[in-house]
Amino acid sequence: MESANASTPAKTIDQLCKECNLSMHSLQILCVFCRKTLSTAEVYAFQYKSLYIVWRGQFPFAACACCLEIQGKINQFRHFDFAGFAVTVEEDTKQSILDVLIRCYLCHKPLCEVEKLRHILQKARFIKLNSSWKGRCFHCWSSCMENILP
């Protein structure tokens, strides 16, 4: 499945579908890590999370939900820089916390303003992994907090 425009290969699922004249529902794309075919829900989730496809040879790959979470955990251990509250993020980036692109460190979804504000109100730290700020989305927040709640 080669991109129609070889000089600039598609970066997103949406672009790939347009170039190949496919619907997202009918797209068959493999996970770059485990090589399994993503389910329809995973294809839509990948697009919703604003993640980029990767090209290996002439073929596009995405990442399944399980591998995204595993990679998130691996990144925590391998690339942890430091943790800090919202003020630290703002000092580090010289931007308002609401303007900084912060992704969930498990599912990789960009955090919305409400999710960032939850970190502030709950006095939860953001973590810097491999020079990028990460936090927890609503979905992953509960699964992250289950282990520390009585």
Curated annotation (Swiss-Prot):
<dbReference type="GO" id="GO:0003677">
    <property type="term" value="F:DNA binding"/>
</dbReference>
<dbReference type="GO" id="GO:0006355">
    <property type="term" value="P:regulation of DNA-templated transcription"/>
</dbReference>
<keyword id="KW-0804">Transcription</keyword>
<dbReference type="InterPro" id="IPR001334">
    <property type="entry name" value="E6"/>
</dbReference>
<comment type="similarity">
    <text>Belongs to the papillomaviridae E6 protein family.</text>
</comment>
<keyword id="KW-0863">Zinc-finger</keyword>
<keyword id="KW-0244">Early protein</keyword>
<dbReference type="InterPro" id="IPR038575">
    <property type="entry name" value="E6_sf"/>
</dbReference>
<dbReference type="GO" id="GO:0006351">
    <property type="term" value="P:DNA-templated transcription"/>
</dbReference>
<feature type="zinc finger region">
    <location>
        <begin position="31"/>
        <end position="67"/>
    </location>
</feature>
<keyword id="KW-1090">Inhibition of host innate immune response by virus</keyword>
<dbReference type="GO" id="GO:0042025">
    <property type="term" value="C:host cell nucleus"/>
</dbReference>
<dbReference type="Pfam" id="PF00518">
    <property type="entry name" value="E6"/>
</dbReference>
<keyword id="KW-1035">Host cytoplasm</keyword>
<comment type="function">
    <text>Plays a major role in the induction and maintenance of cellular transformation. E6 associates with host UBE3A/E6-AP ubiquitin-protein ligase and modulates its activity. Sequesters tumor suppressor TP53 in the host cytoplasm and modulates its activity by interacting with host EP300 that results in the reduction of TP53 acetylation and activation. In turn, apoptosis induced by DNA damage is inhibited. E6 also protects host keratinocytes from apoptosis by mediating the degradation of host BAK1. May also inhibit host immune response.</text>
</comment>
<comment type="subunit">
    <text>Forms homodimers. Interacts with ubiquitin-protein ligase UBE3A/E6-AP; this interaction stimulates UBE3A ubiquitin activity. Interacts with host TP53 and EP300; this interaction inhibits TP53 activity.</text>
</comment>
<keyword id="KW-1119">Modulation of host cell apoptosis by virus</keyword>
<dbReference type="GO" id="GO:0052170">
    <property type="term" value="P:symbiont-mediated suppression of host innate immune response"/>
</dbReference>
<protein>
    <recommendedName>
        <fullName>Protein E6</fullName>
    </recommendedName>
</protein>
<dbReference type="GO" id="GO:0008270">
    <property type="term" value="F:zinc ion binding"/>
</dbReference>
<dbReference type="GO" id="GO:0039502">
    <property type="term" value="P:symbiont-mediated suppression of host type I interferon-mediated signaling pathway"/>
</dbReference>
<keyword id="KW-0479">Metal-binding</keyword>
<keyword id="KW-0010">Activator</keyword>
<keyword id="KW-1048">Host nucleus</keyword>
<dbReference type="GO" id="GO:0039648">
    <property type="term" value="P:symbiont-mediated perturbation of host ubiquitin-like protein modification"/>
</dbReference>
<feature type="zinc finger region">
    <location>
        <begin position="104"/>
        <end position="140"/>
    </location>
</feature>
<keyword id="KW-0862">Zinc</keyword>
<keyword id="KW-0899">Viral immunoevasion</keyword>
<dbReference type="GO" id="GO:0052150">
    <property type="term" value="P:symbiont-mediated perturbation of host apoptosis"/>
</dbReference>
<keyword id="KW-0805">Transcription regulation</keyword>
<dbReference type="GO" id="GO:0030430">
    <property type="term" value="C:host cell cytoplasm"/>
</dbReference>
<keyword id="KW-0945">Host-virus interaction</keyword>
<keyword id="KW-0238">DNA-binding</keyword>
